[in-house]
Structure formats: structure tokens, C-alpha cells
Amino acid sequence: MKRLEGKVAIVTSSTRGIGRASAEALAKEGALVYLAARSEELANEVIADIKKQGGVAKFVYFNAREEETYTSMVEKVAEAEGRIDILVNNYGGTNVNLDKNLTAGDTDEFFRILKDNVQSVYLPAKAAIPHMEKVGGGSIVNISTIGSVVPDISRIAYCVSKSAINSLTQNIALQYARKNIRCNAVLPGLIGTRAALENMTDEFRDSFLGHVPLNRVGRPEDIANAVLYYASDDSGYVTGMIHEVAGGFALGTPQYSEYCPR
């Protein structure tokens, strides 16, 4: 029997990158996966690929710019399937043109990004937990970032918002542990998604990798493997974890890249 047989999962922003890889991993293990996304056309392409791999997936409309859809997507899935077992909060964003350091960054944009990213966990979790309680438990997996625990020279809004998600993760974990609802966060490092690669120079990438002991850019599947672990009963005695999946980034001293060159 597959690890997630009979389970119903929701994955936000799941038509590409980490979200898509996570949806595919959950479906491969038997979950019925709802792709929460803006574009039904893009979602259907992923659904077709999942079907080819022997899995089952469906589309539910979600748009981070339409706050009410955080709740409506959950309610639509619960109404259609009668249960929700797994929630993967993958959505997160910034504005590379305005999210800079404290004095150079745009103040209004700082608070917009903070609100956007925190509510991307708060609202769907709040909506899903009552449905998880009805079926005796569930698992919430929040996608954060290594930048939430290692300060950055830029992207202050993104990093602070993801730090808040780490705290929210642990608060949810504690508050609902007695209901058998687990909540964990996965913190990606440098992952080779299109969005990430389009926003970095080769020079930046090489400099960053100098501080990654495993000496490679991560793959979306690396994150999906962690998501699958927390979604399944393999982690049935684990909650409140802030799990870095970053190739060992920041393990070394500041001189690491000098004394252990690539």
C-alpha cells in the first residue's frame, strides 16, 4: 500500500517548481492532490503528467491576490472530498525591485510582502484545521526559506516574512498537537527553479555555492522529498520542525569557501 493512499492533499502554487514537484511526489504515493493555482490550463498540464505516472490530481482555483480564495479553495476541496488530510503551503513571493535592505527598500512594499506571505500560511491553515480535526488529524507543511534563519544583505521583507512563518509553524504545531495535527516547515536553500535562476547572475550563483558544502544547486525534488516525509506517517512523531534543506549552507565558518574551494 502506498504511503498516502486514501489521503486528500492541497498544494498551493503547484504548477511549477517546488509546488509541482511536491504535488507529483504526493500523488505518486497515492494521495488525491488538488493543485491550487490561478491557471487551470497550466494545472491541467501537471494533472495530465501526474495521470501518466499513475496518480490522481484535480484543480482548485487559488489566487494570492484574492484573499478570499485561501479559504474558498479549502472549503471547495472539503465539500468535494469530505476530508482534508494534507496541506502544503507553498506560495511565497517578493519584489526584487523594491525588496532590498532596510533603508533602500520600499516601506509600503515591505508590509505588503509581509502580509502576503504570512497570510499564505495563516488563512489556509485556519480553514483546513477544522476539517483535519473531523478525520482525526492531518499534516501541514509550510515552505519557508534558508533566508529565514540566515540574515541576508537584501530581501528584508521576504526574509522577515518567512521568519514569521517559522514561528507560525511552531505555534500551530503546539496548539493542535493534541488533535493529532502536525505542522512542520521546510526551508529551501538555492533551488534551481526558473524563478530563482532568472533572478541571479552566474557570479552570484557561484559565490553562493562557495558556501554550500554539498556543492550544487538544489532541485525541486530535494524539497519535495522533505515535503513527502512530513506529509506521511514516516514523520508521525515529528512536529514543529524548522527543517533546512539547503546543502549544508551556513554550516561552515566565514572562511569555508576560501579553505574549501569548489
Curated annotation (Swiss-Prot):
SUPFAM superfamilies referenced in this protein's UniProt entry, alphabetically: NAD(P)-binding Rossmann-fold domains
Thermal dependence of function as given in the entry: Optimum temperature is 40 degrees Celsius. No activity is detected above 60 degrees Celsius.
Regulation: Activated by metal ions such as Mg(2+), Na(+) and K(+).
pH dependence: Shows a maximum of activity between pH 7.5 and 8.0 both in the oxidation reaction of cholate and in the reduction reaction of 3alpha,12alpha-dihydroxy-7-oxo-5beta-cholanate.
A Pfam family: adh_short_C2
Residues where taurochenodeoxycholate binds: T145, Y158
Keywords: Bile acid catabolism, Lipid degradation, Lipid metabolism, NADP, Nucleotide-binding, Oxidoreductase, Steroid metabolism
EC number(s) on file: 1.1.1.-
CDD domains: SDR_c
Induction, as annotated: Up-regulated by bile acids, when grown in the presence of deoxycholate or chenodeoxycholate.
Binding residues annotated for NADP(+), in chain numbering: 13-18, 38, 63-64, 90, 158, 162, 191-195
NCBIfam families: PRK07231.1
Record protein name field: 7alpha-hydroxysteroid dehydrogenase
Organism: Clostridium sardiniense
Lineage of producing organism: Bacteria, Bacillati, Bacillota, Clostridia, Eubacteriales
